[in-house]
Amino acid sequence: MPVYENKHRPITDDERRMILETIPKHYAGTMVLTMLCCGLRPIEIRRMKWDWIDFESAILTVGKSKTEAGTGRKIPIPPVLLDALKEHKAKELNNEYVFVKYEKHTRMDDNAFYQSWKNFVKEMDLANGAHLYRNQVKNSIIAPDFEPYLLRHTFCTDCQAAGVPINVAKEWMGHSDISVTAKIYTHMVDEVFEQNRMRMAQYAVTKSQQVESSTATN
């Protein structure tokens, strides 16, 4: 059984493309989309219940139902995932858990999670140039380190790219210490660099205009 931890890179744009193309075609697609859009840990995916989801407010509360007292870890659900979860729920009306064992429809354990992930990656691989020989994938184009925690790391870097403050991302990720979040945020992606470069350029222009205006009125 592989160990899903210490994966310190986001997925590439090409990996994201392959994931998004495979999601609609695979039984584990909604599970993978949830990891990508909400940054859940594998154990949280396995424990995820329908009453964690508030479909009206589009909020996922990890570890607590929306009717329980107290606060859980709240994560916003983007529209694309909300629609996928609604469709998925129609297939799993009699289950307490969102993601269950394939065909058996019972609670997913770690082995079932791994098998679902492995099967998803295999489908993704075959759809992008690999082929089967004696039931073994040949000429794989998937990176050897492509494992579930990469999606969690990607969610965090997506937060950074979208301009989410680090203290908010820390809460969404469920990190006990903001230094853990900071280790991810310090790996600045190109688009974040460009966004902030433009902000600083605009600030410099605005500040110069303010100084010129102040000088002109004196």
Each PLM stretch: what is its role?
Residues 18-26, 38, 75, 91-97, ...:
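Short, basic (Lys/Arg/His-rich) helix/loop patches that form interaction surfaces
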Residues 52-59, 145, 164-184, 207:
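Short, polar N-cap/turn motifs at the start of nucleic acid-interacting alpha helices
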Residues 7-8, 63-72, 101-109, 138-150, ...:
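Short, contiguous acidic/charged loop-to-helix segments that flank catalytic cores in large enzymes
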Residues 57, 87, 91, 103-105, ...:
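C-terminal secondary-structure termini that scaffold catalytic or DNA-interacting sites
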Residues 2-4, 10, 62-68, 105, ...:
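Catalytic-site neighborhood detector that most strongly recognizes the C-terminal catalytic loop/helix
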Residues 59, 72-76:
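Well-ordered beta-strand positions in beta-sheet-rich domains
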Residues 1-46, 56, 67-70, 92:
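Basic, Lys/Arg- and aromatic-enriched nucleic-acid-binding interface segment
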Residues 1-3, 131-139, 198-201:
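Short, charged hinge/linker segments at domain and secondary-structure junctions
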